[in-house]
Amino acid sequence: MKHLTEMVRQHKAGKTNGIYAVCSAHPLVLEAAIRYASANQTPLLIEATSNQVDQFGGYTGMTPADFRGFVCQLADSLNFPQDALILGGDHLGPNRWQNLPAAQAMANADDLIKSYVAAGFKKIHLDCSMSCQDDPIPLTDDIVAERAARLAKVAEETCLEHFGEADLEYVIGTEVPVPGGAHETLSELAVTTPDAARATLEAHRHAFEKQGLNAIWPRIIALVVQPGVEFDHTNVIDYQPAKATALSQMVENYETLIFEAHSTDYQTPQSLRQLVIDHFAILKVGPALTFALREALFSLAAIEEELVPAKACSGLRQVLENVMLDRPEYWQSHYHGDGNARRLARGYSYSDRVRYYWPDSQIDDAFAHLVRNLADSPIPLPLISQYLPLQYVKVRSGELQPTPRELIINHIQDILAQYHTACEGQ
């Protein structure tokens, strides 16, 4: 995957460029991302997490091969070149099997890596930082690195077997807290120290040497660290460059390495740009994209209520609420407080747990019903101005068709545009 290696090379040469990673499996989010990358003639990095997609199907019901097929089919339908598409696997390791003994969890992790690599994923994030059932808490750097090296060996062997060459690119390390947004209310966040980052790198270098993997070190392109960015349900901790200065300077001593920043969702455009300048040059974004999708759908549902008799409405918001109450497993342990606080969180939280519910057949039917209702006749411009004001400006200037799908996709692309600008470089 020359795109990533070339991006890192240019960044290390002073271009202050980067790349964003779209971490979503929602078809409309992916369509928005593919169309945006196509219009801007940039490569597109799409990542699946070990929770979403695994050899058993993950919570999306897709294996890595299924996910690749799904994304490639969508890209083909939109005439996006396959060679500009990069697929990544995020937090690959024993994450899904922490309740099992380490030996069993790591055997599953071996198979997880095989399934991702065999399916053609080229950017592999090795994350063995989580303790399994019979492990100490927390794990030492050495144990984490030994397990990552074991998975790297599996990945290399699988890649050679299936593709005749080893061209994988690796990301190592992890951020704190866990992926997908913090569970608790945040006020400040500890930035990874340079010493901790160096210790992670050295432990991995030593473990890779022991596995005979010295040659792949230049293909370890990024280290995941915590630059001090995070979000909870209603708050965002903004990037403060001064707190990350020492960390940022530390990576300048490694000629083929940059940082990868997770949970960059909801950062300001200025913060996103500064992160890239400060060598956090791979920006992960996921919940902010499905949050934008949800915003657009709620806006269209409000427009529908103004235009369509109640008995003919899709009732999307009520259907969504009913399904979330019937199946609370994706939000119950995340949203706290009284009934009203939990209701607001279900609809509006930055952590966007609602994203797990869009594939539900009842909700999908209501979405299709909403789109049908609003596609029958033109949406009055004053209602677009009221509920989707940013899109209204583009509709009036003639650059955007005011159909439900185009309004949704463009609203998502407003977020992608911030990431594109941050990553463009000088």
Swiss-Prot record:
The entry sums up its family as follows: Belongs to the GatZ/KbaZ family. KbaZ subfamily.
Source domain of life is: Bacteria
Question: Could you tell me which Gene3D superfamilies the record lists for this protein?
Answer: Aldolase class I, putative tagatose 6-phosphate kinase domain like
Q: What lineage is this protein's organism placed in?
A: Bacteria, Pseudomonadati, Pseudomonadota, Gammaproteobacteria, Enterobacterales
Pfam families from the xrefs?
A: GatZ_KbaZ-like
From the Swiss-Prot or TrEMBL record, give the protein name: D-tagatose-1,6-bisphosphate aldolase subunit KbaZ
Gene Ontology CC: plasma membrane
List GO BP terms, alphabetically: carbohydrate metabolic process; D-tagatose 6-phosphate catabolic process; phosphoenolpyruvate-dependent sugar phosphotransferase system
Q: Spell out the subunit comment.
A: Forms a complex with KbaY.
Give the originating organism.
Escherichia coli O127:H6 (strain E2348/69 / EPEC)
Q: What role is this protein assigned? A: Component of the tagatose-1,6-bisphosphate aldolase KbaYZ that is required for full activity and stability of the Y subunit. Could have a chaperone-like function for the proper and stable folding of KbaY. When expressed alone, KbaZ does not show any aldolase activity.
